[in-house]
Amino acid sequence: MLNIEQIKEIIPHRYPFLLVDQVLEVEEGKRAVGIKNVSANEEFFNGHFPEYAVMPGVLIVEALAQVGAIAILKKEENRGRLAFFGGIDHCRFKKQVRPGDQLRLEVELTRVRGPIGKGKAVATVDGEIVCEAEITFALGEKKE
């Protein structure tokens, strides 16, 4: 299990764009399972939507991508690198995510060749799928 400080040692995201609160499981280079506690205080709820708060789907996908990045960047040879979002395929949103929900974010890396990889990503709330997608990423170096 990884807490928020340990997550911040692996990926560069910070508030308000760090969308993973904890990691429950990680198999380096293979898969990871994370949690995002969706609070009524999230900044994005101010505009999406003021009268009926719904977490934007693109942020659910971004949260999944961050969990996938943790899975690949936890691997020893990738430490200190960056994982860039490369693409989304077959993305479907099945249910709304509202304040008070706990998102369970699961990403299984299905193919990694050189600096390019793909993963099967599934987000659930209370065991029900809210989003699923195939995500593509590219590993890169930090440039000073």
Swiss-Prot record:
Top-rank lineage group of the source organism: Bacteria
Enzyme nomenclature, EC number: 4.2.1.59
GO CC annotation terms, alphabetical: cytoplasm; membrane
Active-site residues, as the UniProt record annotates them: H48
Keyword check for Lipid metabolism: yes
Keywords of the record: Cytoplasm, Lipid A biosynthesis, Lipid biosynthesis, Lipid metabolism, Lyase
Gene Ontology MF terms in the entry: (3R)-hydroxyacyl-[acyl-carrier-protein] dehydratase activity
Matching InterPro entries: FabA_FabZ (IPR013114), FabZ (IPR010084), HotDog_dom_sf (IPR029069)
Catalytic reaction annotation: a (3R)-hydroxyacyl-[ACP] = a (2E)-enoyl-[ACP] + H2O
A biological process term (GO) from this entry: lipid A biosynthetic process
Annotated Pfam families: FabA
EC supergroup of this enzyme: lyase
Subcellular location per the Swiss-Prot or TrEMBL entry: Cytoplasm
Similarity remark: Belongs to the thioester dehydratase family. FabZ subfamily.
Protein purpose: Involved in unsaturated fatty acids biosynthesis. Catalyzes the dehydration of short chain beta-hydroxyacyl-ACPs and long chain saturated and unsaturated beta-hydroxyacyl-ACPs.
Name this polypeptide is given: 3-hydroxyacyl-[acyl-carrier-protein] dehydratase FabZ
Gene from which the chain derives: fabZ
